[in-house]
């Protein structure tokens, strides 16, 4: 409940031009991206060894946040103790983010936001989306030197890309909305077929592929030859196996089949 409280407080004060992809549907992401007009040169950021980079400075930030939000003192002290005293028969572990920790996604996202706001000169026009260690901004962000000294102390190091076809969590972002990377969906479909597991995940893949199909030429014009071929094969596989579809997306692909 405390982690849900922290998340609720974060969303309570988050400006609408910032987006956290947690507990949100794809339609919400799509509408937000359309408002953000992701066109021209955008900024993508990824991190080197993100979980291993969550050092003592990030823990200090988390503890300060919990104190500010009024969480129980014993809970905060227990969290600090666990973070500083994990070990094995070989010795103590360095402070980092371990799998299975409480609210890993939320704290990773906040660390990502903290780094972004300290590293870049944020104005009032950018739309920026965050999810764990993923970040994408609707404009080319300018680096500021104001906090350079502190940022150099962090193990957290960003790999920054300035791109005209921005992506976020496997989705292409454009002024017309979102569409999933076709090669990514096709590869997952092929793996599911090999494992004889297509029936359990085809609905999800069909929903993802539908976003590109709905955009039509607006998506096609942004795809290269490899992406177009992958998108075609995705639709073909879904239609050939549409008897496996269980959700409302079945009607969408039935209409496509009639048009073909």
UniProtKB/Swiss-Prot annotation:
Keyword annotations from UniProtKB, A to Z: ATP-binding, Helicase, Hydrolase, Multifunctional enzyme, Nucleotide-binding, Nucleotidyltransferase, RNA-directed RNA polymerase, Transferase, Viral RNA replication
Gene Ontology terms, MF aspect: ATP binding; ATP hydrolysis activity; RNA binding; RNA helicase activity; RNA-directed RNA polymerase activity
Source domain of life: Viruses
InterPro entries hit by this protein: DNA/RNA_pol_sf, RNA-dep_RNA_pol_alsuvir, RNA-dir_pol_PSvirus
PROSITE patterns assigned: RDRP_SSRNA_POS (PS50507)
GO biological process entries: DNA-templated transcription; viral RNA genome replication
Residue ranges occupied by any RdRp catalytic domain in the UniProt entry: 40-147
Family under the similarity heading: Belongs to the potexviruses/carlaviruses RNA replication protein family.
Pfam families, per database record: RdRP_2 (PF00978)
Name by which UniProt lists this protein: RNA replication protein
Keyword Transferase: yes
EC number: 2.7.7.48, 3.6.4.13
Biological role: RNA replication. The central part of this protein possibly functions as an ATP-binding helicase.
Native organism: Chrysanthemum virus B
Keyword Ion transport assigned: no
């Amino acid at each position: 409940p405390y982690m849900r409280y922290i998340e609720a407080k974060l969303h309570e004060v988050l400006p609408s031009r910032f987006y956290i992809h947690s507990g949100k549907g794809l339609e919400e992401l799509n509408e937000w991206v359309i408002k953000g007009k992701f066109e021209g040169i955008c900024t993508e950021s990824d991190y080197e060894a993100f979980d291993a980079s969550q050092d003592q400075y990030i823990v200090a930030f988390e503890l300060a946040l919990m104190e500010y939000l009024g969480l129980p003192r014993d809970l905060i002290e227990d969290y600090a103790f666990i973070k500083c005293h994990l070990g094995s028969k070989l010795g103590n572990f360095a402070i980092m983010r371990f799998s299975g920790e409480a609210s890993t996604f939320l704290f990773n996202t906040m660390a990502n936001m903290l780094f972004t706001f300290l590293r870049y000169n944020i104005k009032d026009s950018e739309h920026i989306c965050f999810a764990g260690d993923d970040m994408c901004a609707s404009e080319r962000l300018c680096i500021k030197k104001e906090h350079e000294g502190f940022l150099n102390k962090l193990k957290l190091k960003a790999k920054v890309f300035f791109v005209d076809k921005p992506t976020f969590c496997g989705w292409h972002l454009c002024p017309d909305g979102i569409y999933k990377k076709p090669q990514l969906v096709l590869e997952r479909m092929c793996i599911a077929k090999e494992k004889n597991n297509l029936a359990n995940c085809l609905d999800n893949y069909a929903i993802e592929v539908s976003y590109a199909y709905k955009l039509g030429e607006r998506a096609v014009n942004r795809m290269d030859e490899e992406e177009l071929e992958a998108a075609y094969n995705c639709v073909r596989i879904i239609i050939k196996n549409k008897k496996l579809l269980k959700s409302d997306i079945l009607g969408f692909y039935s209409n496509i089949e009639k048009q073909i």
